[in-house]
Amino acid sequence: MHIFDELKERGLIFQTTDEEALRQELEEGQVSYYTGYDPTADSLHLGHLVAILTSRRLQLAGHKPYALVGGATGLIGDPSFKDAERSLQTKETVEGWVKSIQGQLAGLLDFENGQNKAEMVNNYDWFSDISFIDFLRDVGKYFTVNYMMSKESVKKRIETGISYTEFAYQIMQGYDFFILNQKHGVTLQIGGSDQWGNMTAGTELLRRKADKTGHVITVPLITDASGKKFGKSEGNAVWLNADKTSPYEMYQFWMNVMDDDAVRFLKIFTFLSLDEIEEIRKQFEAAPHERLAQKILAREVVTLVHGEKAYQEALNITEQLFAGNIKNLSVKELKQGLRGVPNYQVQAEDNLNIVDLLVTAGVVNSKRQAREDVQNGAIYVNGDRIQDLDYTLSDADKLENELTVIRRGKKKYFVLTY
């Protein structure tokens, strides 16, 4: 199957410039292309992964990727479909974020093997060398204000206000495409569908300044069940950095996707063949309660981002927590699996009697409720059911001398730390 057809079949092409011309270029030989990543945080997230994996698919088809990290544009801020002006970050902060993002990209694209090995570029390298006057003369004169105002990302901000800084962002992104074309022969840019206006600024600059044709492919913005896209600004980001979103949390995210999304996400986020995914679909629809699609999706993406060992650890944490086998997990694994649950720092003066502690730690609201829960067998300490009202926590309950896990009922966890 032609790579363009595969991208379409996987639902990875939202919009493109001249499809026939782009398809022909991809058929005739190796195409150099790029995707840009602005350092707006110290990590990329699942919203970025769609474009990254699309880039990797093209690389596997023999084409050459350039990963552009926006050391310059990250200092400015992209206004695309944001309700308010982005906060400007210090140069030092952005430089740190650039390094973090470069490290993540290095694990998802092949930067070492073959004639089409990926290359990393930073647009600060060329923006730091051009003066404001030269930029206005050599770049700005090719863009009319009417053209810039016509962009949807700008229109949506006119009423509430947009700074010249953000207004000029599209020209900067256009200049990135121009520079990469001149230096590396790049003729294709890949990005999210909210970037269409900025991306076509690049094809416009290529056409007007160099009389060359550039192409654009936008990938769809992936939304959650409520219709929100995955992103930092939206507050529902699943980060690629394990310190921000643990492999276990990422595993749980994929395990909890809706049935209607599971097969679609297999096409977008995994490298399983379309034939394999079709077979999974048939089995999944025959027995949706077994959640086969979600299990395979979680396995494939966690392994892709964090590695096989992290996947096996996430799977083990899931199985042990489900069974209530707290003592089968290390404190490191427990911290990963129980991150985000209520946490209470035990004080030296605290009464460690189970009834008093349940109230002090906020597990229940009253001693009466605590006594009822204990007597009814609803309270567990490190997986062991406690029904003795006089039970008092001891050093034996401190796992690795760091924490104790309290469970109320089947699923409500609380962590005591020392």
Curated annotation (Swiss-Prot):
Belongs to the class-I aminoacyl-tRNA synthetase family. TyrS type 1 subfamily. PANTHER family: TYROSINE--TRNA LIGASE, MITOCHONDRIAL (PTHR11766:SF0), TYROSYL-TRNA SYNTHETASE (PTHR11766). Residues 352-418 form the S4 RNA-binding domain. It catalyses: tRNA(Tyr) + L-tyrosine + ATP = L-tyrosyl-tRNA(Tyr) + AMP + diphosphate + H(+). This is Tyrosine--tRNA ligase. GO terms for molecular function: ATP binding; RNA binding; tyrosine-tRNA ligase activity. One of its GO terms (cellular component) is cytosol. Its main location: cytoplasm. The keyword RNA-binding applies. It comes from Streptococcus gordonii (strain Challis / ATCC 35105 / BCRC 15272 / CH1 / DL1 / V288). NCBIfam families: tyrS. A motif ('HIGH' region) lies at residues 39-48. SMART domains: S4. It comes from the Bacteria. It is found in: Cytoplasm. Homodimer. InterPro entries: aa-tRNA-synth_I_CS, aa-tRNA-synth_Ic, Rossmann-like_a/b/a_fold, S4_RNA-bd, S4_RNA-bd_sf, SYY-like_C, Tyr-tRNA-ligase, Tyr-tRNA-ligase_bac-type. Keywords: Aminoacyl-tRNA synthetase, ATP-binding, Cytoplasm, Ligase, Nucleotide-binding, Protein biosynthesis, RNA-binding. Pfam families: SYY_C-terminal, tRNA-synt_1b.
